[in-house]
Amino acid sequence: MTEFDLSTREGRWKHFGSVDPIEGTKPTTKNEMTDLQSTHKDFLFEIEEVGIKNLVYPVLVDQYQTAGTFSFSTSLTKDEKGINMSRIIESVEKHYDNGIELEFNTLYQVLRTLQTNMKQNAAGVDVSGKWFFDRYSPTTNIKAVGNADVTYGLAIDGDKVTRKELTIEATVTTLCPCSKEISEYSAHNQRGVVTVKTYINKDQNIVDDYKNKILDAMEANASSILYPILKRPDEKRVTERAYENPRFVEDLIRLIAADLVEFDWLDGFDIECRNEESIHQHDAFAKLKYRK
């Protein structure tokens, strides 16, 4: 058995099974290597979407940097074998400045770069991340940082936008109307998870504070908003407000829809509310879809 010098890293590697590289016969320079993806012949079908998923990259949501999870895709003609996937991240890097700004205009420019680099007509992106914002306690007005989950979806064909979507997931308080009605005092309440997927008009300018308007529709219609910091006067106000505004899951999604339907820059929306029931072992949920 060969003895290795265990005082060196290389010796320890070989002691644990590493071997020297072989003398290869295939090309080692890029220009000499076969580019299978660029093979051109009849491959029977064109592909609508091909790309990468779960790409984690820094993003900027308003003034905060956070981690974004991306899915990028392009089309592929039937006479091309595949895409050069490394060009996707190269396209992203051209727009990187301490993060990719999560705004539709920035994502549109990324997709236009992707189209050019991939030499394809269609391109799309979905990216999700945490949205952080200032949240003030309702009575003492103490500032802290709240958060919600946002997902942007955008697709283009040529220079035309074919898909423009924003999804927000936020947590709220819901107090049970039935419990309030039948009980001598108090009522059970729980945390509700509200998800709103909006379909944004592709031909109309969107308002500047669109995220805040959607979030306000989600939170203001609940029994109460959630706050990072609550002092005793705040807790009293939150508790009493919830009791004053009882909501079933059915009530909440209908009230949210009534606000969203007034936004002329939306073509439609999907709403789901899921209550993590405090007196059951199961959750309660309701869903609603609307198209103008």
UniProtKB/Swiss-Prot annotation:
<comment type="pathway">
    <text>Cofactor biosynthesis; 7,8-dihydroneopterin triphosphate biosynthesis; 7,8-dihydroneopterin triphosphate from GTP: step 1/1.</text>
</comment>
<dbReference type="GO" id="GO:0003934">
    <property type="term" value="F:GTP cyclohydrolase I activity"/>
</dbReference>
<comment type="function">
    <text>Converts GTP to 7,8-dihydroneopterin triphosphate.</text>
</comment>
<dbReference type="InterPro" id="IPR003801">
    <property type="entry name" value="GTP_cyclohydrolase_FolE2/MptA"/>
</dbReference>
<dbReference type="Pfam" id="PF02649">
    <property type="entry name" value="GCHY-1"/>
</dbReference>
<keyword id="KW-0378">Hydrolase</keyword>
<comment type="similarity">
    <text>Belongs to the GTP cyclohydrolase IV family.</text>
</comment>
<protein>
    <recommendedName>
        <fullName>GTP cyclohydrolase FolE2</fullName>
        <ecNumber>3.5.4.16</ecNumber>
    </recommendedName>
</protein>
<feature type="site" description="May be catalytically important">
    <location>
        <position position="176"/>
    </location>
</feature>
<dbReference type="InterPro" id="IPR022838">
    <property type="entry name" value="GTP_cyclohydrolase_FolE2"/>
</dbReference>
<dbReference type="GO" id="GO:0046654">
    <property type="term" value="P:tetrahydrofolate biosynthetic process"/>
</dbReference>
